[in-house]
Swiss-Prot record:
UniProt-recorded name of the protein: Bifunctional purine biosynthesis protein PurH
Reaction(s) this enzyme catalyzes, per UniProt: (6R)-10-formyltetrahydrofolate + 5-amino-1-(5-phospho-beta-D-ribosyl)imidazole-4-carboxamide = 5-formamido-1-(5-phospho-D-ribosyl)imidazole-4-carboxamide + (6S)-5,6,7,8-tetrahydrofolate; IMP + H2O = 5-formamido-1-(5-phospho-D-ribosyl)imidazole-4-carboxamide
Species of provenance: Oenococcus oeni (strain ATCC BAA-331 / PSU-1)
Signal peptide: none
Pathway: Purine metabolism; IMP biosynthesis via de novo pathway; 5-formamido-1-(5-phospho-D-ribosyl)imidazole-4-carboxamide from 5-amino-1-(5-phospho-D-ribosyl)imidazole-4-carboxamide (10-formyl THF route): step 1/1; Purine metabolism; IMP biosynthesis via de novo pathway; IMP from 5-formamido-1-(5-phospho-D-ribosyl)imidazole-4-carboxamide: step 1/1
Amino acid sequence: MKRALLSVSDKRGLIDFAKGLIKNNYEIISTGGTLKFLTEAGVKAKAVEEITGFPEILNGRVKTLHPKIHAALLAKRENSEHMKTLEEHQITPIDLLAVNLYPFKETIEKKDVSYDQAIENIDIGGPSMLRSAAKNARDVIVVVDPDDYDSILKAIANDDLSHDFRRHLQAKTFRHTAAYDALIADYLSKEEYPEKLTVTYDKDFDLRYGENPNQTAAVYADAIPKAYSILQAKILHGKKLSYNNIKDADAALRTIADFQDQPTVVTLKHMNPAGIGQAITIEKAWDKAFYADDISIFGGIVVLNREVDLATAQKMHTIFLEIIIAPGFSEEAYQILAKKKNLRLLTVAMTNTLPKELELTSVLGGAVVQEMDRLVENAADFEVVSSAKPTDEQLEALVFAQKAVKHVKSNAILIAAQGQTLGIGAGQPNRIDSVKIAFKHAEAKKNFDQAVLASDAFFPMDDSVEFAAEHGIKAIVEPGGSIKDKDSIAMADKLGVVLVFSHNRHFRH
């Protein structure tokens, strides 16, 4: 008869699994709550204490940390010395170990959880047994996932416990314990950039392909859910998102997070805003975002920060969109939008601010890590450096434009008026070209006479200020900081335009 040790916090499928093991000539030993759960269901099982001859102590902190458990897991069956040692100490080998760990993640997700509560949910015995069993996976079947129970029972029944199958379970176990420890380390870490960066993500699903069809890809979600995360979105209608959909939707959600004070709509293509509109109603905000660029929006993504109503849905229904994201949809809005088979409708929880977390970007051989750009632009932080002073309306427009340009790929120039982007110049190697592209889109707009201009970084020369002023711009905001700032200020004064320094750069690569 073989022996299996079962000690789990997640009891899904456990009864059927234990019964299947008994049917295949396994003796069951167990601990604490798992033992009680099994015996109450009529499954015959022995307590670990019967095996070790030692009781649980320290309120359950020490249950399985015993040589009769770990030797039973670690002994190599083909090693005669190992087996002789087991016999001398009257230790029966353990052939299968099923363990899942104390719910540390679920504990720290609870509101107002204390440090002591979190610490008490750090499993010690479980990871120790798993590591012992996984090290000896050639002889011990190691199980961390209830979803594997059926395949394991089938393999046992068919005597098909191949090397590859055991290796698969072994690797899965070490990933499981590594992720568990990474989560604990992250919770306890106070250093922003510790000497070891431990991160853990859970696989969500495989993608058909990555950025291009020749690239494989999959989606992994943060172990702890975050606000504004596209990976926490609920798909109400349509198929799963693609790699590019996810990247674009993430960029759109990051953008709209800066505009929670009023109803706002962001349209986006290829991780750049196509249009941003802000108004007193979500319908009017849609109108502004749509007319900001009614060409680029085709096949794009739309994110709204208020519930989608019928009037807004009727307007969106007339054009081809890939994805619409909002906190919610009225029943009437949903019914009209869901008529389009290939349109995805998603809901995402939106709070006042983005979560504070580090951003990781892979480079060959490693990663660069930085704090997320969560800076909130405020007119109180602006410095007027020109002789001309902004009106209240201009100042409001400058704040809006500076918030928006933060989300455009560098070199970034954005022209805006009255809560609406009019023209966006993105991703050019030199700033003056971005200026010209922005003007190409903006000049024909009916409210261009009210337009202001924002730049994500300083002007290295005065040519951008000169071009903007000569083409009708009356107010400009930029970070400042160039060795030639004086030239830009002089040009602004010469041409009578307002120049404001925000002192905050927003490069986006």
